[in-house]
From Swiss-Prot:
Predominant location: plastid
Organism: Hordeum vulgare
Biological function: DNA-dependent RNA polymerase catalyzes the transcription of DNA into RNA using the four ribonucleoside triphosphates as substrates.
Annotated compartments: Plastid, Chloroplast
Record's subunit section: In plastids the minimal PEP RNA polymerase catalytic core is composed of four subunits: alpha, beta, beta', and beta''. When a (nuclear-encoded) sigma factor is associated with the core the holoenzyme is formed, which can initiate transcription.
EC class: transferase
Reaction it catalyzes: RNA(n) + a ribonucleoside 5'-triphosphate = RNA(n+1) + diphosphate
Pfam family for this entry, one: RNA_pol_Rpb2_2
UniProt KW keywords: Chloroplast, DNA-directed RNA polymerase, Nucleotidyltransferase, Plastid, Transcription, Transferase
Name of the protein: DNA-directed RNA polymerase subunit beta
Gene: rpoB
PROSITE patterns: RNA_POL_BETA
Amino acid sequence: MLRNGNEGMSTIPGFSQIQFEGFFRFINQALAEELDKFPTIKDPDHEIAFQLFAKGYQLLEPSIKERDAVYESLTYSSELYVSARLIFGFDVQKQTISIGNIPIMNSLGTFIINGIYRIVINQILLSPGIYYRSELDHKGISIYTGTIISDWGGRSELAIDKKERIWARVSRKQKISILVLSSAMGSNLREILDNVSYPEIFLSFPNAKEKKRIESKEKAILEFYQQFACVGGDLVFSESLCEELQKKFFQQKCELGRIGRRNMNRRLNLDIPQNNTFLLPRDVLAATDHLIGMKFGTGILDDDDMNHLKNKRIRSVADLLQDQFGLALGRLQHAVQKTIRRVFIRQSKPTPQTLVTPTSTSILLITTYETFFGTYPLSQVFDQTNPLTQTVHGRKVSCLGPGGLTGRTASFRSRDIHPSHYGRICPIDTSEGINVGLTGSLAIHARIDHLWGSIESPFYEISAEKAKEKKERQVVYLSPNRDEYYMIAAGNSLSLNQGIQEEQVVPARYRQEFLTIAWEQIHVRSIFPFQYFSIGGSLIPFIEHNDANRALMSSNMQRQAVPLSRSEKCIVGTGLERQTALDSRVSVIAEREGKIISTDSHKILLSSSGKTISIPLVNHRRSNKNTCMHQKPRVPRGKSIKKGQILAEGAATVGGELALGKNVLVAYMPWEGYNFEDAVLISERLVYEDIYTSFHIRKYEIQTDTTSQGSAEKITKEIPHLEEHLLRNLDKNGVVRLGSWVETGDILVGKLTPQIASESSYIAEAGLLRAIFGLEVSTSKETSLKLPIGGRGRVIDVKWIQRDPLDIMVRVYILQKREIKVGDKVAGRHGNKGIISKILPRQDMPYLQDGTPVDMVFNPLGVPSRMNVGQIFESSLGLAGDLLKKHYRIAPFDERYEQEASRKLVFSELYEASKETKNPWVFEPEYPGKSRIFDGRTGDPFEQPVLIGKSYILKLIHQVDEKIHGRSTGPYSLVTQQPVRGRAKQGGQRVGEMEVWALEGFGVAHILQEILTYKSDHLIARQEILNATIWGKRIPNHEDPPESFRVLVRELRSLALELNHFLVSEKNFQVNREEV
């Protein structure tokens, strides 16, 4: 992307830049803005005034390191100091005081809250302002409405009814005449008529009664309050009534904010100053004028497109943190007012620091932020599955959350791709399921204008003269409301190759339409083929040959790939792998040049400018998704290094490039039905050679508490009644030793909970002691931390966290090595996913003409119907690259150079590989890309030639070890008495309606009876059946109904319907009238 002489130079921006810019704005601007709003707190009775100053605030360096905050479950935060002034009589005191702690963003663009990495994702909302729409009612008459949206999301509507009367609907309850609203806001009838374009329409509808209501502002306010609050009777005008109206209506529905004021001025051609952020009578009258113009055909009949990005704004991390800071300052204000009152009761002399006491008042700030990070929907646990996930998570944009849409109510139109998303929001990358289209990802070149909250995309500016002279081209960033006025060359993304002469006629985009026009008429052009996609979409090679639905699945599944024990970079890639790995910050980059003194698994010592610098490395650290984060040194001792060089590689990176999977030999053919319906057949080589082996770290913790009797729990090795075998790994303190291999059921931490024995359980000696000496005999209950099912592994770390002598938390970290096995999920980069169905011995796998057995067998029927042909190009080119020892980095949409460019590239490389290796089977002209292969079991060739290749296949985090589950007995639901749902609750297997039909179809009455009664909700029968099974007795046949039937009867009774049920005798089929 870089060119000689910096001509038209463009670079991909840092992928985490959006988060950093947002936090930078919060620290530098937002804090000062909120401190400026903090009011002077006055107490006139005692002549005291307290004030905070925005100028010169300071943030101290965090008192703990990031790693310590994670291990000790603390918040990584910085203390905020602000200048304060206290006037007490004639005494003026100035002090710099601490008002609390603010969470600080780390180098990953995340926050550490109570030891957990969390990230705030960007929210996309409807921008404040006014929006017009027209719709037909049931009689076919056009209804015109204008919706005013406030900065807080409150809505008010202006509408013209069938009788051509203008109404304002300020809440769902009531509509109010526009004249009453304008008068209540401070305008009289004369001013209203002077400021509108259609005074005759305004004068046509008020009758004598309405004119009387708007004679004075007070009467208008009373009328407005009565209709707004739905209050009847005779009201009297008062200050408290005005305050309530101000609080409930004007603050919530009329505050437009900076963005809303700009939008309102633009839409209605007003020139109201930007600092006037509230809705004015002039706005309402201009909005009504426009509405009348639409209704009577004198104005522009244009409905606003609510889904256009020019009508949306981004609420970034800066806006959300600023809101919370304002909320915390509001609480601080109330706390200071209470403290002032308390000071005068005690008759002590106040100082600024005593009013903001560190223990009570200043803790408000950090608790406000911790509550926000813990409960706000857009604050999410940072996804650390692999480096790609870490990079992508901060670039998400979501329509969900407070003030936004919900998954259940959002319309199809709001989920759709919009032309204005082009180059700003990726048309591919979104979640599957109920939130499809509501969460998206920013395109790689997009940036957020933090001042106005719009998403901007870069283009090359081309004027007619510059196009002829081929001079330097300037990159311009266009916001969504600006690019409608430009002719944008759409398909002409040849910025990678300046030398190619532009065509005479090019496809272009103008006002959301696609045209074909002369090159001379083009204003701007796109700068890069990847410009329209997110990071996930940009990592898919040959994406142009895939169906968009499969590309969507691929971009989601790459984020679920598990880092493997031995990573390998892809043979066929897109060129974005290096930037993605770099911006994830999982690798260690040299910040200065120097010479390596020594390296080990924990640190690298670097000598630079006469100083010795220690660079710590991450060593087998658990991620939020239980994957293993580990850094390996990649520089030998004594080597001189330069700034920016890679010193150590993180998980899933090789040579500074992203390496999520493995290049394996695949064949597309059916094999004995084992790859039916997306199942995958694999070779045992993938298991024995640790090709798809990954490491996972599980965390188990236990905490000591004080019992209700006041006795403290104790961590100890001395636990009676337990076998020595279960305690074999404990040290003298009762905690498992480092390096121990532990199995299911082993004790990790021994713990005893004291409890007072009941009198009936006393032994004779204990009763004697109690009678003579009055001593209580205490017993202890064993409450140790045991290793649950599926947790076997090696203990790699044990952490003691002791905040006070009685409150001890012990955390045990266990490393598991997981080979690939039947039931694990694997996927390619084209949405081709499958479950391992069988692991074959390598001698039974199909093999090539040179004797190489294939590693995976995919079903060829998975390609034509899904239309993800990119995997065919990738596997064939991968085979050529493997034989030629080459790696390919291919930009998408190469068909813009010539027809069938991808196919020509693949075939030419296969032909080259065939010549180079002297293997004619690599490229056979009769069926290029395919080859005759042999059955490993018989040695006979298969009837048809088979497509073989090297594909990059990922192992996903959906592993069978965490899915497989069985239950004999377990917990039951309280109401229905049926087994609960889910593996985490030790729940049962659901047999739904369709499963019952299937069993009915085979006539298996007894199995059906067991499933629906004994194994489910027949209370008495399920107890007796357990005993009968254990003792080998006949299973009893019970006549009383199951619990779910009783629940149905009760529900019918609640509807006043009595259901009587009887038993039919089996002998003579007579109704037994005795009610069950």
